[in-house]
From Swiss-Prot:
This is Clustered mitochondria protein homolog. One of its GO terms (cellular component) is cytoplasm. Residues 38-100, 237-258, 696-763, 949-984, 1373-1442 are annotated as: Disordered. Its main location: cytoplasm.
Amino acid sequence: MQFLSPQMEQKLHRATIHQITVSKTGDMPIRFRLRHLNYRNNKKQKNGKDKETTPPPTTTGAKEPLVNGHSAAVNGMNGHTSEGEQQKDKTAAEDKKKPDSDVMEIIQDTGFTVQILSPGVEPLSIQVSSMELVQEIHQLLMDREDTCHRTCFSLQLDGVTLDNFAELKNIEGLKEGSIIKVVEEPYTMREARIHVRHVRDLLKSMDPADAYNGVDCSSLTFLHTITQGDILEKKKGRSESVDCTPPEHIMPGAKDRPLLPLQPGVGKKGPQPLKVLTTSAWNPPPGPRKLHGDLMYLYVVTMEDKRFHISACPRGFFINQSSDDVFDPRPDNPSYLCHSLIDLLSQISPTFRRCFAQMQKKRTQRHPFERVATPYQVYTWSAPALEHTIDAIRAEDTFSSKLGYEEHIPGQTRDWNEELQTTRELPRETLPERLLRERAIFKVHSDFVTAATRGAMAVIDGNVMAINPGEDAKMQMFIWNNIFFSLGFDVRDHYKELGGDAAAFVAPRNDLHGVRVYSAVDVEGLYTLGTVVIDYRGYRVTAQSIIPGILEREQEQSVVYGSIDFGKTVLSHEKYLELLNNAGKHLKILPHSVLNEKEEEIELCSSVECKGIIGNDGRHYILDLLRTFPPDVNFLKLDEELSKDCKALGFPIEHKHKLSCLRQELLEAFVESRYLMFIKHAAFQLQQLNSAKLKQKQEAKDSKDSEKKEEPKAIEAAPVAKEPAKKDAAESNNNVESKEECPKKGSTDKAKDKSAGVPKVETEEAKKLMESLLSSDEKNESKEVVKRACEAVGSLKEYEFDIRFNPDVYSPGIKHVDNQSAANSLKKQKQLVKDAAEFLVKHQIPSFVHDCLDHTAAPMDGTTLTETLHSRGINVRYLGKVANLLAKIKQLEYLHTIAVSELIIRAAKHIFTSYMQNTEMMSMAAAISHFLNCFLTATTAVSHSGSLSESDALTKSGSSGGKQQRRQNKRSAGSKGGKPSFQCTQDNNEWQLLTPKSLWSQIEKELKSYWDYELLPAGAHDSADPVVSHYRLQKISLLRAFCLKTGVQILLREYNFEMKNKPTFGESDIVNVFPVVKHINPRASDAYNFYTTGQSKIQQGYFKDGYDLISEALNLLNNVYGAMHPENAQCLRMLARLSYIMGDPQEALAIQQRAVLMSERVNGIDHPYTIAEYAPLALYCFANSQISTALKLLYRARYLATIVCGENHPDIALLDSNISLILHAVGEYELSLRFLEHALALNIKYYGEKSLKVAVSYHLVARTQSCMGDFRSALNNEKETYAIYKQQLGETHEKTQESSECLRHLTQQAVVLQKKMNDIYSNGKLTSGLPPIHIQPPSMGSVLDMLNAINGIIFVQISSKEIANLKNEIEKRQKEGGTSEQAAAAQASQEEVDRMLTETMAKTAAGIPFEDHDKHELPVAAEASSSKQADNSSNASAQQVS
């Protein structure tokens, strides 16, 4: 590169970065795809997608709340905290430095319209942005229906060809209304291949095979199948004409859980334009034909059964005279020379012309989100039987040693390490720079994950040559496409002391956690390797980018920091100490010293195993981060005792390995709780010290005593934060400086710490008290107080709060430098690690269980349960203890079931891993189906009869001895490519020996040894059945969870688990095995900041401001992640809800439809997040009068939920209430009642018989029964409602009175009915004169109000008259209550009036009586400030009621 001009280098760099931003072949670049496809498909949509959205009112202002922490963001985005906070501090500082115009530049780039002239097509006007590249117009044209068949063309403006990588703003003469011409260019070999591949992609664009096979980042979506097309294009209509009857399997109490409805509409075949399109066996052209311009040959069989051989030349494609057995490349007569292959095929095949037009129409009608590639591959656990077609390009992709050409920067294999590190080095001063940097980081990372996954599969499948082929299969290592692959086995007894293979299996996952946190901290100058951990076919493969130069020298020569032999030889390095110390402040890692074998003192700022290597590129890399965090002593056998509480709970549990570490989330929560304790302790002591002095100063006693009464309250009232705000408490390390030296600095540090999750008022009072005393003369006394507080919380500094952890504190074989009298003695360091582990058991787990009792975000399956535990720092190895706690709480029975099924699945996965390693490739399908039979059914019949016949047939064809001999030879030649399954042939049929009884006894043992969990009923584990019935598990849910955990894909059909005579699963039911991939998730930090600010605005009631900020967050997310990402889906859901609350249900529907589509694509069609997206979409459909669509969506959500977790779940209660209300609206009272009664039963179970939710359910049941004429039952149910309201809200409350009125009406109707019935019985006929029975069918408006209410949205109407009355009442009360001084203050304090007003509204919305003493209990949310409300005659404010 040194010989390139600076301009050329810059252009190449731009090309590289662009390569990063362009996705797979034929897809549009992310940013462009998003805007133009949506602009075209959905002009009505006005949020978040177009970069021309209005920016937030003041961006710099908007960022200010972020400096106070993430209070609003606890469940906003699902990333990790440390990066967010560190970026946040940085961003805040940088935003002060830079002018607003910089921030706006990226958000409001200028848009203008240009005209595109293509040959043979009408002129086309498109909207472009000045920031786009010419390449993006290229991609747009390749995606449009009328121009998609062109790939080899240039764009010209006034006769000048435009540079593909130039930004539009840099092109001279390009302005509003400019005409750009499309000029066909001559083909080269590469362009011809690109064209053929593009044509093939167009022909299979409607085929779901790629999504089922898990390739090219395709994934499934069924939303439009369920709603029968785009919801937005439907006509509004009442649903009387539509059949609203739910399928039988969706009805409450249905026992069947069919699998086929999971993928509706599967098996419908689209139009088929060609039988075969493939490269010809006559390739490549011989020398003489090259000189005539032949580039390649194709072979085509049309639907009319005609066979053609086609030549590609620089001018296009033509028919030649070759046949299957005669090579004659001369042009045929006629030869139909066409520049586009599509045009040629249209001329030779009328069927092709017709079908291709139909396909194009269908393709462009699909929502853009249905066809955009996802950033990471999503695999589906069930698939229909797919037809396998001839596809030369697929074959070429599979067997070529390179990846498809789209993965290459021209002329070289990608240097992953260079790309990953260069993107991190991009500037990040301004918002536009940060966006470009994060976008590049994300794109390179997702490409790396794709390549690493492909490589790992190739390694296990035996398609890659090992770099040490002579060694045993388990010890082999591989390099493929500049990525290094190693297997999860204990090579060279490296982990012998730590647990051998068990430790080697866990180490890559721990290492990945380390890479994640160091990447998130993002210290400039410190580099981590690109790391991906792949589990495939029972093997764990670690894929890493390669440090430049590391392969040229021995590891001993490379390492300049850390130890390669677990602490015997330890090295340190000044630069590494500086870099790691900076990172360690954020990660709570304590710098510490150890002794090497020469007894020399070596300082470290990380664990001993962490190695520092300076690459040939001069960068400082760290690797082997498996002990980034301190060990979890609850799972280690130590010489020291644990606390009594931990021992009582059965700890320590000894694991197979010694690499159990605490999570970063736990350490942050622990440090925060200790800091709170420190502040309270010190403030309380200082307050007591002060009160002693005050007694000596009699003259000031009266005035000071009044202050003292308030302050102790403030200090004593500070409770431990129930859910510490997720703050990177890097500041905490130096929170309280040594006070005697620098009081001012100490005070600023404390001010900074207001956000550390401490209850504000009380803690601030405590701090003020401390500061006022610390600035006094008696420094020695206050110094003593701080010292005592430090001792009380176990601080590692005598006069400062300093809680950090030494990760090596319990590492075997490491000698520590210990100063026993110091504050940071080894004993204290060890105690802190023990305390943190105890904090997990005594505080985090009970608080998790307690918080689950309100069922607000109830986990639906093992994955969501695991995420929830991790967010609190609870490792999955504590799941057994969590399950035991849950078992004791009746309301959490559903969560106990989920926890137990997750335990069983994980235990089964552990056994399955080694089971797969002992199975040879030819028996794989038979072995997996046999395992599933043993795991889920009671039958002992083995399902492998078919498999044996197949392999027997192959074995008999040649002598088995010869076969064995060949294998042995292969092995000694080292060409078995890391397939340990070929190690010993006699093991090949070991899998057949497994029985249901032996498998379940292994599962029982695994549960006991790993989780200390006793599986009930004890001793009755011959098969799954006793366990399933005891814990109320569902076999279909277990099957789904097992397949997702292990990567097994099964055939989509109905499985009968109760069959006694033949096995449930046969080998034909195992369709595929996919990799399970773990990797880090790079974050969009600025978008995160906008999102959290928007959330806090919404919580304050400023919905419009919140909407603008979250729209902007979506904009930035689209910039960084592209169109598809789980965080984009969260943003869309929030925007839809805001649109609905602000009175635009149509807009809400448009946005929520995109949220559902995106969630299906990036999370999976049956992921709990996707299920959660369906319910709001149904609500917005109902609000837009699309009643039958709303029901279909709710039926879909309920069906998916029953597959995932069964009917016993709080979310099912909500879904059933929604379904019943809509069925009630269309007059299907009997069906409605079945769903309502089920919802009522669940609500009583989860919320208690006297909760307001249950009262609402009783009322809905009564309402439905009265519509059916069953007044007696209705009366009984309404009495329940009345009793609950009376008890909870009091007799005078509006709700109680409404219920009372309802009772009166029902009683009246019941009396009328009874009289009529008596009349009939006595006389045999009706006498006239009785009033008619009034059965009032509900209005759509009343049903919608009720739907809003049960979904947590209530609109409160407050007229200006009511506002005026309320203000007068408040002022009157204040005047009565106080002195003239207070009255004056009351008049002046408009804010107080506003606050009380919003509280009144919130109380009204929640249906709670407004009383003086409980005003502070409810979080306030009003749509606008109350001064605005007073001006409006009637104002609707939407409250979100949990």
